[in-house]
Every structure is written in structure tokens, then in C-alpha cells.
Amino acid sequence: DYERAFAVTGTCQWSCIVGNLKKWKEGYVEINFEHEGRPEHLRAWIAENRGREHTVRFEWSAAMTFGQLLEYLGRIPIPPYLNRESEQIDYTRYQTVYSKFEGSVAAPTAGLHFTPELIGGMKARGFGFEEVTLHVGAGTFLPVKDEDAAKHPMHTEHFEVRRATIVALLAKPGAVTAVGTTSVRTLESLPALAWRIHTGVPIDGPGPVGQWELYDIPADYTGRDALEELLAYMDARGLDRIKAATQIMIAPLGYEFRIVRNIITNFHQPKSTLLLLVSAFAGEDWRRIYDYALSHDFRFLSYGDSSVLMR
């Protein structure tokens, strides 16, 4: 629960990707700072080395929550491939107009193109908008290093979908446009939860939606089947939202899209899981799309141009 995690005081542990790890010798690193006229400190040390990620323990003296500490000392975590320090304008520019909850290490950048005026105009023309929550994990920045993409271990991300959103998805079958790969991963994780219900497995029993869990679902189990099963499950328990975690990896390895029909997404860097997702959605056309973007000087990555992919 991110709200509780940010509300702790004094000490906590987080799973982190650590840059310049070789420079971190044994012991702790310390930041000394002033808060409300008093000298304070923040200390951090590696509690456990877990390969790509490390468990880092934080301890601080100031009378503030961990969330307040991050706001006070932290910087906007702009993507490392921008090769610059964060700037004051990033606090508004690197944020969607519809964001509500803290927890992501990156903004869903396809949504940066949407303004209140654009959303209002689209609603006036009959387009419906529904919101989902995905706390984007730091692993989204990790490149796919193995030649065999199937060997790339996916990170875990937590998500939340409201009952009203599931009702809206059922009302417009075949007309779902996901804004960003973040929304795609969230929506496409729902059939895995529904299949657990269908097969009598506790919805949260096995842990996060597994990296390849969706590939094992029978092809004739449709998105509508999944949404109806989830809705019945929620209504039977009086739930107004589903909270879960996912490690879903959408790649051109026979993935079957069940919920999403169209995607609005920026242009992604090579050797990324995001480009694998685009390839799985667009098929071999992804090369033609990216060749066109490159030859016409489209801007790539977070502050770049966007695209609308349709099936």
C-alpha cells in the first residue's frame, strides 16, 4: 500500500535500482540538511544485494513522513536517457493533468499530450474517459540485454481499477484506446485475474500476475468473459475497485490482446520492454512505423511525439 509506505516515519526499506553502485563503499551514505531551522540527517545503506535491485534501508532524524522527506530532498525522476538534471519546470511538464496518486517513478508520457481543453473537447464529441492507476516501477528503465527477450525478468508494478471502469469497458467492447503502455499493462492484466477466479485460484494467492501468466489462458477466453467474471466477483464481495500487482511482459511471442484495441503511445528506445509491447501490438508493421518516424525527424521518448496504433 503506497499511502502507508509514504506515511512511515523514522526508518523504512525500499527496493531500489542504484546508480554508480561501485562508488558506494561499505557503510552508509548521509545527507545533512536543515528543516524548520534545525540540523537534520538522512542515512541510507544497502541492506541486501538482490542482483538488478537492492534493498536499501533509510533512516532520518526529521519529524516528517517518508513522503514528505522525498518531497523535501528529492528531485523529479526524469528518465536517465534525457542525460540532464531535473529542472523546476519538470514538476509541471513531466506530469499528466489527470494524475492523482503518488507512487510512480515515471510519468505515463503518452498522457503528457492531453490538456484539460483537449479532454473536454473529446468528451463533448462523445468520447468517454476512464482512469486506471499503475504505479510505474523503476524496472521500466532497464534495457532488455539478452538476445532472447523471453529471458528478461520483468519488474513488479502495482495497479488499481475501479468497478465503474470495468462497467464502461463492457459497454464499449472493441472500442478501448489505452493512453500509454502503462494503461495497456494495467488493462491487459485484468484477464489474468479473471482467469484465476474462473479456475478457482485465489485472486491474490499466487502473488503478482506472472510474466507469462496471460500466455497460458485459452484463446477462446475473451476480454468480455474476463470483465464479466471480474464484475461478478466484485459485486459478490461489495468491492468498488480491484487492487493487484503485475509482472506482465507483452512481447511478440504469441501474445493475445483481449481488452485493448488501440494504443496512444510515444516512440520508444531500442532494447526496451515498451518497444516489445509495440511490436506485439503492431506486428511487423512496427518497423515501418519507426522507419517513417526516423525519416521524418519525429521526436522520441518522454518529451517526444506520440502515435495512435490501431488494429
Language-model-detected regions and their locations in the chain:
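Surface-exposed, charge/polar-rich loops and edge strands
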Residues: 1-311
